[in-house]
Amino acid sequence: MATHFARGILNTREPLSTRLSAACHQSARLLPEYRQARFRASRSLLAELLFMLYGISELPEIINEANGRPVFSDRQLPRFSIAYTGNIVGVALKGRLRQG
């Protein structure tokens, strides 16, 4: 099972990924202002990683499990993890695209 990792530096001057859905932007607007940039940056990094690895052109819908962990609503997609430290965000994808 493959694990893919990407990291980036949080920078509000850098443009966001064009692969974020309108729903993702709406979810960010519901957060406190200080968390919005971090949320969008992590989702942008995740969207670009999905595009590079699987050719998925828009970030799929993300839901929260009962324990609060974010997952893709489509269970055929790999699991992911997002971590922050200071001004750095890291995204890991575990597994591969499952064929239904």
Feature annotation, model-predicted:
Residues M1-Q99:
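Core catalytic alpha/beta fold that binds nucleotide/phospho-ligands
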